[in-house]
Amino acid sequence: MFNRSEKVAEAIHELVSGLIVKGMKDPRIGFITITGVKVTDDIRQATIYYTVMGDDEARVSTARGLASATGFLRREIGKQLRLKFAPELHFKYDQSIEYGNRIDQLLKEIETEKGSDD
């Protein structure tokens, strides 16, 4: 069963994803994917996890763009979700994709080494 904070997190995920694609014109924000949102039980804070295609420069640039868009996004969340208090937004780069890719790469290397030993 979903509690209120999980429902709000899901709504924020959909809304922020849409706003970034359609509503933001900041050139610093590159090809970004929102991977998850966690909201505190009191709905006062939301952590938005994201990934960015590109190098470290693209990641830094996107982080700056998101930081400057926080007020706009928070205002839109409050308006569109009709919350008494719009949560304070925190953006955090999601390293799980990179971590998974690294594990996959290591497993392939092990498999290649086993194949050459036979």
Curated annotation (Swiss-Prot):
Keyword line: Cytoplasm, Ribosome biogenesis
Cellular component GO terms held in the UniProt record: cytosol
Domain of life of the organism encoding this protein: Bacteria
PROSITE patterns hit by this protein: RBFA
Keyword Cytoplasm carried by entry: yes
GO MF entry, a single one: ribosomal small subunit binding
Pfam families registered for this protein in UniProt: RBFA
PANTHER family xrefs: RIBOSOME-BINDING FACTOR A, CHLOROPLASTIC-RELATED (PTHR33515:SF1)
Protein function: One of several proteins that assist in the late maturation steps of the functional core of the 30S ribosomal subunit. Associates with free 30S ribosomal subunits (but not with 30S subunits that are part of 70S ribosomes or polysomes). Required for efficient processing of 16S rRNA. May interact with the 5'-terminal helix region of 16S rRNA.
Similarity section: Belongs to the RbfA family.
Entry protein name: Ribosome-binding factor A
Gene designation: rbfA
